[in-house]
Amino acid sequence: GGNRAVSRQILDCTLRDGGYINDWRFGRKTITSILDKLECAKIDIIECGFLTGMVQEKECSLFNSTANIEEVLPKRERSSMYVAMIAIGEKELHPSKLTPYDGKSIEGIRLTFHKNEIDLAIEWAHIIMEKGYRVFMQPVGTVFYSDIELLQLVEKMNQLKPYAFYIVD
């Protein structure tokens, strides 16, 4: 029992999830404009796109470094938290290639992983946290987990202590 305060934060993933519609080709001006308007709207967490080892162009919300993301962030003082996604198994950027957190670019990494990638995801999460970033753990396809597998995953996440752990699907 007892009354526990519930805290909610809004996360906008337009530039990452929306990319499945337009192949992440938002255009540089649109990317900077969307980020600026989301900042003005005081959105809690703004996802800028994917961190990927793929070849990318400046017109896409696909980035191969946090420095590339820094270039599109609002230039004024920012109150929103900026993050990017690394999707294990999807032309991902290995976290060893991340530069240490310096406060100029993104603050966090959303890490997605499948059931067969849990141990790898935990290993990667440790690397990301050691570099100073907040890590958000997002298992993919949890509908295919048994109850016991979900409980075991929760236990592993409790040991890891990520900034956030959430179930989407």
Model-based region annotation:
Residues 18, 38, 109, 165:
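Conserved, mostly hydrophobic/aromatic
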Residues 7-13, 35-52:
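N-terminal glycine-rich anion-binding loops that anchor highly charged ligand groups
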Residues 3, 31-40, 154-158:
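Short amphipathic alpha-helices and their capping/turn segments at secondary-structure boundaries
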Residues 150-169:
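Conserved C-terminal portion of the radical SAM core fold
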Residues 45, 50-156:
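Active-site beta->alpha loop and helix N-cap motifs at the rims of alpha/beta catalytic domains
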Residues 1-17, 22-24:
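N-terminal amphipathic alpha-helix/helix-capping segment at the start of soluble metabolic enzymes
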Residues 25-33, 113-120:
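Glycine-rich anion/phosphate-binding loops
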Residues 9, 83, 136, 164-166:
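A structural signal for isolated positions on well-ordered beta-strands in alpha/beta enzyme cores
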